[in-house]
């Protein structure tokens, strides 16, 4: 080799070493456990308090009261929308001193533990205070007159009606389930039972005798009475009353053909405990429902009842429609459960098992006839909202996606269409209120403003005579509104993922009456918090816009390169993508602090608040439909931002997101390098029938006059042999929603494919992981720190961050 060749080879070697050194430097990160520790759920709850208002409307006026907590304590206010005033209910310093004098235990304003605050007769508040320590604790009840600011002690009020009774609207008697049948008590016995269920003077009367185990009254269509229930009174499911309290309707479900499922709680006591419950899986025989109408003969004379013929489809779903609750209902001593309709009839919805056919029906209580008022038919599945009756029930406001978008239609009571009240390429979420006197409705909708994120909800007014939507609230925010009963005013909670939550009061004309509150995030910002960044990318089709949020480490350095982790939930009922601000950001903001970029982004087939095409994109392809969009979104962000390392990509999700994250690392094994998959429904053939059949589809086969249902779906175990990266599977061992068998089947497939993987079982935990969420977080942080960052405390036996919290 000549001298020139030697020099050339030496330069190539030096250049290669430099490249390797640069690559090693870019990957050599330190996981920032301390920053993630600073924003634990416990610590965030000590820094951030109220972020939204729940207005408690007065019974006989448009006033409302609310509470608001900050680092300075809790304040209580009464708002008069007509006058545009906000008045503080209590002088908290004075109240604390008064309470201290009464209970002989010291309190100060910032730490006054007011509980069970209730408004009575629009004139006074009652509340309770617990004072003392440990075994020397007392509860003292108070009455506070609003007009005079007078404070008195009062006897402690217990519930006047037991919670296991469905009380008639007039309060004179209540129906409950016991064993497999229905029973009734008058108000005198109900009040006695509220004080002491063992009172020997309580009188109860049996209404039915034909109920048997697994085919009884008072249970839902996916449950059934057990031996332990035979002597226990409980609230009767699916029972609605006529307004005059003379009748009620209820369902009786035959669930005897539903198979049992089991979980074993290994830590509940001395012996592991078997828990048995009914659980219908896709394609399995379904329950059969029977609708009954009861006519009360008085609490002492029982009731007469008859079956109402309602069957239209095999294994149909039946839902009895309830009337909307009003502010006055909240001041009753019992939960009012009135049917939608009047004294002459009520409404029910029946839907075919494949959910492609839905009928809104009215049942006439005198003729026992069932009439279909509105029918909906789809080739995927029909969704619906509870109808809104106006004109004394003569007209119906009906929500439908029949034109590919969710809109509101006005019908006459006989089922004839009057007009479309809304019509456009946007999504109406719900009717907030109706003012018939002035002829308008208030509704929440998104996607109307085409220059905004289409998920951002707004409040609109539309005339009952039809016309253009009038937006009443602020632009470029996600708004959650609550309207007064007469729909003259509404309280708007608004924020964005990158905007501090605030609350404003509006009139139905769009006048901004008052800015009520802004969340105090000062302590959070002092700790180093920074808002995430919103972004927009394209779906894999290159056409559909997808929206997301990017969470960076709070010590972000733009000159460094970071791994990226995608927090996912595929839908179809919701996406993981955050639109409004929330302090519950453990799996996004907090996870990023160990030293990663974390994103959330939608995908076709995800959120229902866009077009029906977008929402139903995954129909028939429930495993893979969102994966390509997630991958392409990450690739676009990597091309857009030089600080993102596309060679270190992670993915994480819970429930449907656990299913999706595992599918992603198996479907694209060269792209996703690490996945943490929690409580995933990895095999939807053993997940619950309703969700799986709705969102994937079920084939209805009719042969020789009988209808059967066939379900087939792709699963994660089928592609387990594709694993190349690092996968951690997590499940609670008594998850009775997504059964642990979903994860075990993936484990079985991985073992048989000779794959290494990690698994974490959380003992005694249900679907949400309960009190082991903090432990889970650090195990997840360890996993990504090891496989994406290259610096982990995974091998240390103690999680010191939990010991410090």
Q: PLM features: residue spans?
A:
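Bacterial Sec-dependent N-terminal signal peptides
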Residues: 1-31
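Residue-level detector of intrinsically disordered/flexible regions characterized by low predicted structural confidence
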Residues: 4-8, 12-14, 145, 162, ...
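Glycine-centered structural positions embedded in regular secondary structure
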Residues: 19, 36, 218-220, 510, ...
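Short intrinsically disordered, low-complexity segments
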Residues: 20-22, 40, 644
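Beta-propeller folds
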Residues: 28-501, 505-506, 793-794, 799-801
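Serine-hydrolase catalytic core recognition
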Residues: 55, 260, 334-335, 343, ...
